[in-house]
Design a protein with these regions (language model features):
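Juxtamembrane "anchor/assembly" segments of surface/extracellular structural proteins
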Residues: 5-105, 109-279, 296, 325, ...
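Charged- and aromatic-enriched interaction segments used to assemble
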Residues: 136-186, 308-415
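Short beta-strand-plus-loop segments that form exposed binding edges in beta-rich domains
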Residues: 286-294
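Extracellular carbohydrate recognition
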Residues: 293-305
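Internal alpha-helical scaffold/solenoid segments in large eukaryotic proteins
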Residues: 284-285, 383
């Protein structure tokens, strides 16, 4: 097609079912036959259509069924009888242009699997091997790819996430203590969560010893005790003392006879105090009694709320094979095309830095599994691109390009209709009206206290609109949870069984960098996204893929049915604040892409504008309708007008 649009050239006057100048070529077994129009029985039904895929790009399609009579009937019948399942034929339609030469409109193979002979007419469908049709047929198929065959030149340098290590302890319920010796307190551990060990040796079986310290990480080690204690009204001591100590750091709390109180003890051991301490390096807990003479006290531990030793640790950096989004897209398109080259995938750059600086990693690569594979489908890739970045596919011939949805709806006026139209209709598309929105990622169950810190799960908002109960789902099938990556990395080198996460796909915000060692790699991006409400803000990554950023990427589309979103719930940590904006804050939408209205009309204006991404205007009953092309179709040979459907942008007084 000419880039200036579809031009219809007429053989007769304008408003009388105009015949256009076309020629038909049937190719049978490699021989071309120019057919008279009379050989195609349904010549006046053949049409072409431009249709927008939702709020994505516009796709051109044509009539797929042809009815052959006369000479064409005989040629096709002979071909079928002679060659049976190996019969081969094509139909091509050419249309004259302004230069009085012919442009090809249709050139498709005929599908002998649909061969139907009525004795006078042979009906056959064309084989639609267009890119759009191939994708539609195979978009949900999951493919697997060896990471080694598709990985980028550089690896991802994963410098790890700070993890909180927790050792929980317990003691007995009742102690009898005297002033001469400490109570017989023996401490035992239970339900520990250790990401990186080697700092403590516990369960020693020695009175009062919580753990020996073998080392202290740079962030130090903390011990904390909180328990409800009763000093029974027995004996005549002055008071009992609960003490927690380590490497010269001590805290003590007294309790008097007959008293019940909550004892809280907290100490910290820095690496410096550990290194300089000259005696046994351990965490020690004791119960003692203060009295000037021989007596005793009975101490009851009513409830242990917390008795723990904690420290933050960070594991050694690792390198992970990474894949660019464009590479994944082209792998999928090649698979969809039967393993052949011929369909090219592109992703628009310089629109969203979050996408420009993004790489994909397979779960098996994070775990370091040999011959790691990436498991994904075209549908998952599309859903990821749309939900996280607001990017949608545009199919143009054999090129599939992902662009931001907003760029497909220009504010420039490309066509104006005033009175030159008929059969006007206006209606509301209720499918575009949403009462609530779910945005983010599927909830993951980590079985770890550190996982409570993760916030990249599903967040829900209300639009305030109650016309429908429709729910907009902006859920990415690819994962961005930092803790999910860390937990998989911790399994490296361990002989663990496979789990569901091994098939997952992750993505990270990373940029090409040079390490101090001189190695080129993808390095995690942490600057530009200030975060609070997490355990270690300085080491958190993938902050740019938070749910509010996803809403922002799709805000104009969401604006079709809402101007403000009210936070209702989150599956994860909802106390996060990013760049001084809380995840729980309401989300205000200042601009909408369009409205939920649609307009239909017919016109004898023969030119469909191109490009088709701008505004088309229409005047009806003194109102000016502005909208975007949703669909337009017209017959090729016998032109009887164009039928339009527009997505309404606005309505105003003309």
């Amino acid at each position: 097609m000419k880039p200036v649009g579809f031009f219809f050239i007429f053989a007769r006057g304008r408003f009388n079912s105009i015949k256009m100048l076309c020629k038909y070529v049937l190719t049978v077994a490699g021989t071309m036959y120019e057919l008279p129009k009379s050989c195609i029985r349904n010549w006046d039904e053949i049409k072409r259509t431009l249709k927008r895929d939702g709020f994505g790009g516009v796709i051109r399609t044509f009539t797929s069924k042809f009815e052959f009579v006369g000479e064409a009937y005989e040629l096709l019948l002979d071909e079928w009888v002679e060659k049976y399942l190996f019969a081969d034929a094509r139909i091509a339609i050419y249309e004259i242009n302004n230069q009085h030469t012919y442009d090809i409109v249709i050139n498709s193979k005929l599908d002998f699997g649909t061969f139907d002979n009525s004795g006078y007419t042979i009906s056959m469908n064309t084989v639609d091997n267009s890119t759009a049709t191939l994708i539609k047929a195979n978009k949900g198929t999951q493919y697997e790819y060896l990471v080694d065959e598709i990985k980028a030149v550089h690896q991802l340098y994963y410098d790890r996430l700070d993890m909180q290590n927790i050792l929980n302890f317990s003691i007995g319920d009742t102690y009898t203590v005297n002033p001469i010796e400490l109570a017989d307190v023996y401490v035992s551990s239970y339900s520990n969560e250790i990401s990186k060990g080697g700092y403590l040796e516990y369960d020693k079986g020695e009175k009062g010893v919580v753990a020996d310290l073998l080392g202290v990480p740079a962030s130090g080690i903390k011990a904390y005790v909180e328990m409800d204690v009763e000093y029974e009204n027995s004996g005549d001591a002055e008071y009992a003392t609960f003490t927690l100590s380590s490497c010269g750091n001590t805290q003590a709390v007294n309790i008097s006879k007959g008293e019940t109180k909550t004892i809280i003890l907290s100490i910290s051991v820095s690496k410096a105090s550990f290194d300089s301490y000259g005696q046994r390096k351990m965490v020690y807990f004791s119960i003692s009694l203060k009295a000037s003479h021989t007596t005793y006290a009975k101490i009851n531990i009513k409830k242990i709320k917390e008795f723990k030793v904690t420290y933050n640790s960070i594991s050694d950096p690792i390198y992970i094979d990474a894949i660019t989004p464009t590479r994944v897209l082209n792998c999928l398109l090649k698979s969809i095309n039967g393993g052949k080259e011929g369909i090219t995938g592109k992703i628009a750059s310089n629109y969203d830095s979050r996408l420009d600086n993004c790489v994909i990693v397979a779960a098996e690569s994070i775990r370091g599994i040999p011959d790691a594979k990436l498991y994904t489908s075209y549908t998952k890739f599309v859903d990821w691109m749309e939900s996280v970045f607001g990017f949608v596919p545009v199919i143009d011939g054999n090129i599939v390009q992902f662009v931001h949805r907003d760029t497909l709806f220009s504010t420039s006026i490309i066509k104006e209709f005033e009175v030159d139209h008929t059969e006007f209709t206006y209606s509301v598309d209720e499918k575009l009206i949403y009462s609530s929105i779910r945005v983010g990622y599927d909830k993951q169950d980590y079985d770890s206290i550190n996982g409570r810190d993760e916030f990249r799960f599903t967040t829900e908002y209300m639009t305030g609109v109650d016309i429908t109960d429709n729910k907009l789902e902006l859920i990415s099938p690819y994962r961005a949870d930092a803790y999910g990556i860390e937990f998989l990395a911790q399994k490296r080198g361990k002989n663990t069984t496979d789990n569901e996460s091994d098939n997952d796909v992750f993505f990270v915000g990373a940029a090409d960098s040079i390490l101090t060692s001189g190695v080129m790699c993808y390095k995690l991006i942490r600057t530009g996204w200030n975060i609070s409400g997490v355990l270690n803000p300085d080491k958190m990554f993938n902050v740019m893929y938070n749910q509010r950023a996803m809403l922002l990427a799709n805000s104009k589309y969401i604006g079709i049915s809402a101007d403000k979103l009210e936070f209702t719930s989150s599956d994860g940590n909802s106390d996060v604040v990013i760049n001084n904006i809380a995840l729980k804050d309401n989300f205000v939408i200042s601009e909408k892409l369009a409205t939920c209205g649609k307009v239909g009309f017919n016109t004898y204006d023969e030119v469909i504008p191109s490009p088709v991404d701008g505004i088309i205007t229409l005047v009806k009953d003194e109102y000016l309708y502005k909208g975007f092309l949703s669909e337009a179709d017209g017959q090729i040979e016998r032109f009887d007008g164009l039928k339009y459907e527009l997505i309404v942008k606005s309505i105003s007084k003309a």
